[in-house]
Regions:
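Alpha-helical interaction segments
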Residues: 1-2, 34, 66-67
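Thiol-based oxidoreductase modules, predominantly thioredoxin-like and allied folds used
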Residues: 6-7, 26-40, 46-48
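Non-catalytic, surface beta->alpha helical segment in thiol-disulfide oxidoreductase systems
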Residues: 55-80
Length: 80
């Protein structure tokens, strides 16, 4: 099953704005602090935050989305 890696940071205002949306989404996700988990951030080449990376069960990237997007956009992206 796929899940979302939600790359974020405590100092990032758009990340803070996206947090409640992700909580309401009902989608499987793991929040990753780019300052704390630099290895995972580097693995996926994260350059901007917030970034959502959809991965398969093995951690292979399927697709990604950057920015503070509305819930419907995130759900359509994940389910598409």
């Amino acid at each position: 099953m796929s899940k979302i890696l939600y790359f974020s940071s405590g100092w990032c205002n758009p990340c803070k704005q996206l947090a409640p949306t992700m909580e309401k989404s009902g989608l499987p996700y793991q929040k990753v602090d780019v300052d704390m988990d630099t290895e995972l951030s580097a693995k996926y080449g994260i350059r901007n935050i917030p970034t959502l990376v959809k991965v398969d069960a093995n951690g292979n990237e399927i697709s990604r989305m950057t920015g503070n997007n509305p819930l419907s956009t995130i759900q359509n992206w994940y389910n598409g």
